[in-house]
UniProtKB/Swiss-Prot annotation:
UniProt modified residues of type N6-(pyridoxal phosphate)lysine: 239
Descriptive protein name: Putative 8-amino-7-oxononanoate synthase
Cofactor(s) recorded in Swiss-Prot or TrEMBL: pyridoxal 5'-phosphate
Organism: Caulobacter sp. (strain K31)
EC number: 2.3.1.47
Assembly mode: Homodimer.
Binding site for pyridoxal 5'-phosphate: 109-110, 182, 207-210, 236-239
One GO BP: biotin biosynthetic process
């Protein structure tokens, strides 16, 4: 019988042989888009802090003040004593931003999706997922016990055909997608998805983790499709808003049920006061500075034009390399030039589609974007 350590070591060896082993690398972000690794300063194009708010003086001051008033942690589940006043204030602000009736805040985006889906789907139901949906959407569907049916990426015809085949035999149906896809940067056709859902009595879930704060003056991807009906608007506080946590915006009835039945809310400690206060301060900035929210996409589009890629739809630009080792080599070559662009490999992306995932911030200097484009252009031409 193999020991536990032998089992782990064997798996690590196989992953390393396939260039798929991942390791943590201590990284210090002191301010802006400059990070330090192994004593060397690099310009990062791998951070999701799209607006640079994680180090904004007003955001940091709000977090510090919240600690002074409420303490470092929430101390308990929200249903016990962890529902500090900042959480209801944050929920009201998020609901207003997303044009929803109500909102509930979770400890993270992952917890939001893995709490949401099992609350509204179970045995006898179906969950149809975009094949490229985020891992936490898949995890939530798996936890639910519902039948999981993937549909081809952004293919509403395929979705409609699957619903025509399976909807009548299911009690309820959820259709789940990213609003902005985290590895490809493209946007879901929420208007068409909504129409298909309405025609087939299905509930649409959109994960807008990478859209809020940077699209439609900060309102996110759903605001690009004002006619779309999206009963579940999920998102995070950890990217453009520079803090931490997740949320679901929905009707009051949906939110009330989540607050009493979502296991990841009921059995998790409430979001710390500092994180909630930081997110509130970030929302103030997003609402007051629409020009700031437009910068990440503008910089991404300047880059795609420079390297000969189609115009970016979001601040995320993938440069497909192919094999995992080749993507690692490309990342190391850019690091040697002073840029941190992390290689994304399977299983995060499909086999043969390892890539450089380039994330643009409002704080990236235009001259450095141009220099990065010069270095990346040969990889684009090679495809």
């Amino acid at each position: 019988m193999h020991s536990l350590d032998t089992y782990a070591a064997d798996k690590i060896e196989r992953l390393e042989a396939a260039s798929l082993l991942r390791r943590l690398k201590p990284t210090q972000r002191s301010a802006g888009v400059v990070v330090e690794r192994d004593g060397r300063k690099l310009l990062s194009f791998s951070c999701n802090d799209y607006l640079g708010l994680a180090h904004h003086p007003k955001v940091k001051a709000a977090a510090q003040a919240a600690i002074e008033t409420y303490g470092a942690g929430s101390g308990a589940s929200r249903l016990v004593t962890g529902d500090h006043p900042l959480l209801s204030e944050l929920e009201a602000r998020l609901a207003r931003l997303k044009g929803a009736e109500a909102c509930v805040v979770f400890g993270s985006g992952y917890l939001a999706n893995t709490g949401l889906i099992p609350t509204f789907a179970g045995k006898g139901d179906i969950v149809l997922l975009d094949e490229l949906a985020h891992a936490c959407i898949w995890a939530g569907a798996q936890l639910s016990g519902a039948r999981i049916i993937p549909f081809a990426h952004n293919d509403t015809d395929h979705l409609a055909a699957l619903l025509a085949e399976h909807r009548s035999s299911a009690r309820h149906a959820i259709v789940a997608t990213d609003g902005v896809f985290s590895m490809d940067g493209d946007i879901a056709p929420l208007d068409w998805l909504s129409a298909v859902c309405e025609a087939n009595d299905a509930w649409l879930l959109s994960d807008d983790a990478h859209g809020v704060g940077v699209l439609a003056q900060g309102k996110g991807s759903a605001a690009l499709f004002p006619e779309a009906q999206i009963p579940f608007q999920m998102g995070t506080l950890s990217k453009a808003l520079g803090s931490y946590g997740g949320y679901v915006c929905a009707s009051q009835a949906v939110v009330d049920l989540l607050k009493t039945r979502a296991r990841t809310l009921v059995y998790s400690t409430g979001l710390p006061p500092a994180a909630a206060a930081a997110a509130l301060a970030a929302l103030d900035i997003v609402e007051a500075e629409p020009a700031l929210t437009a910068l990440p996409l503008a910089k991404a589009r300047a880059f795609t034009q420079a390297v000969g890629l189609p115009p970016a739809a979001s601040p995320i630009v993938p440069v497909i390399i192919g094999e995992a080792q080749d993507a690692l080599d490309a990342s190391r070559a850019l690091e040697a030039e002073g840029f941190l662009v992390v290689a994304i490999r399977p299983p995060t992306v499909p086999a043969g589609a390892a890539r450089l995932r380039i994330a643009f911030s409002a704080e990236h200097p235009d001259a450095e974007i141009a220099r990065l484009a010069e270095l990346v252009r040969p990889y684009v031409k090679a495809r």
